[in-house]
Amino acid sequence: MENRIEMSQLRASKKDSKISYVLLMATKLYLESGQPVGSKLLEETYCSDLSSATIRNYFAQLETNGFLRKNHISGGRIPTDLAFRYYADHNAPFLEQEEILAIQQKLTELPEYSKNIVKDLQKASEVLSDILQLPVCFSSPRFESDSVINIQLVAIDDQRVVFVLSTEFGQVFTDVLWLPEQLPENSLKRIEGFLQNYLRKQPSDSLLSQKEEDLGMVLYNEVVVRYLTRYCHFSEEDLYQTGLSRLLKYETFKDPETLAQGLAFFENRKHMCQLLNTYLHKETPTAFIGRELTDIVGNTDPSCAVITIPYYMDRTPLGAFGVLGPMNLPYQQVFGTLSLFTERLKVILTQSFYKFKLSFRRPCPTDPRCSQRPAELTRSSSIKLLPAKELS
């Protein structure tokens, strides 16, 4: 990639390490202040051994090489995506002790172990988003031997109803179903109660009419078939997102076009799955900054950054978390937070998998198990279609 080549040229050709130091300190100062960096201010803060004139000369060279750009209003310099990449590559993850304690306290909101694995991962993403004050997404495989524990029906209008199906592992499946006719008042609630009793193997309500029971069975079988279709045949990991509105607090995303680019990328399942899977076996955070996202996003210059890190069960990667933000992220703190977060999550997931004997499978566009052993996959979902005689 062109960006990587330019950086390697900087490393290979630098005759004076002070140029590199000026770049790192200018980027650091910009991240701290959010303002263009002038030579005098940099001299007063981090480069007292260099004169303003020398710093300006270094600025000019860095600007020529594409690492800094001049602010036409103040005359100060602003780091480019290449500068942020260089900074991210040359600074180890770092957290103050107070930050570590605060994060550890926040992580106590997560359970020690749980069978409700998907719900817990969703909770973990909420906690991470709250810690970083950034949008978070994560990919997840499909967990085997799941079972439906609740069914809800919500009327949209006279002929359509939303069917909400939730599972023991925390999966939520929704779909829209058409009703053959308008139902009397409270009829939908009675059908919902009948289906919930059926799941729990409890006696049905005597107030339910035969017509309502028959309709409930038809709706149940329809939604189960749709659920099993999605469960058995999936070509991408399940993807979950939270905290998108947190982008609005950053100056970069107050520009509608930049905000639209960032959200469009985060909402694109194909792009996000591709990005999250890129370094699935790398246990440390990976940053994709600015133009490095171009090949995936498809536009000219997404002015944002995505940082990913896989999460593990023992030594096996299950998926990855991704954080979306502006290019001027505090990379050291974000890297440190992600590492601390996934270390804790690894302990929770490992305990949960061994305690409850959980298993999972990954997506495949042409999963041979889906075509050769559909009955086995259907059984592992713990959802069974009603026998035909129960529909009569």
Swiss-Prot record:
Family under the similarity heading: Belongs to the HrcA family.
InterPro entries in alphabetical order: GAF-like_dom_sf (IPR029016), HrcA (IPR002571), HrcA_C (IPR021153), WH-like_DNA-bd_sf (IPR036388), WH_DNA-bd_sf (IPR036390)
PANTHER family: HEAT-INDUCIBLE TRANSCRIPTION REPRESSOR HRCA
NCBIfam families: hrcA
Organism this protein belongs to: Chlamydia trachomatis serovar L2 (strain ATCC VR-902B / DSM 19102 / 434/Bu)
One MF term in the entry's GO annotations: DNA binding
Alphabetic keyword roster: Repressor, Stress response, Transcription, Transcription regulation
Protein task: Negative regulator of class I heat shock genes (grpE-dnaK-dnaJ and groELS operons). Prevents heat-shock induction of these operons.
Protein origin, superkingdom: Bacteria
GO biological process: negative regulation of DNA-templated transcription
Protein's name according to its UniProt entry: Heat-inducible transcription repressor HrcA
